[in-house]
Amino acid sequence: MRILVVEDDPEVRSAIKMVLEAEAYEVAESGDGADALAKLRVSPQPSLILLDLMMPGMNGWQFMDEVRVHPGLRQVPIIVVPAYGSADGVLSVGATDYLKKPFAPETLLAVVSRHT
């Protein structure tokens, strides 16, 4: 199962990758929305996307807009992983679920397993 992690903080991205790879998930990484879209055009479709909202360049909101209109990607589950504030509204604009930071590895795995 392939998961795309879109997160601008390299430490958070690395921690998520480590937890997922320990459970035999294949992980692709991206530091912003534009890079993630470019990877989606040339890489195999992920089974799930973990998405930060606040990123430089193309943020998570803009990324979701792009993914949800793409015929080959609109059904891929997106789990939003916001750092600050609430996740209000993310489900109505294309997110499948959300997981607020900070989170325990067990919580991350539970949310991911619900959607894979």
Model-derived regions, located:
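Receiver (REC) domain active-site loop signature in two-component systems and cognate sites
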Residues: M55
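Acidic, metal-coordinating helix/loop segments flanking the phosphotransfer/catalytic sites
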Residues: E29-L48, V90
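Hydrophobic/aromatic residues positioned on beta-strands within the core alpha/beta folds
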Residues: I79-V81
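C-terminal output helix
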Residues: F103-R114
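Active-site residues of response regulator receiver
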Residues: D52
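Two-component/phosphorelay signaling modules centered on CheY-like receiver
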Residues: P10-A28, H115
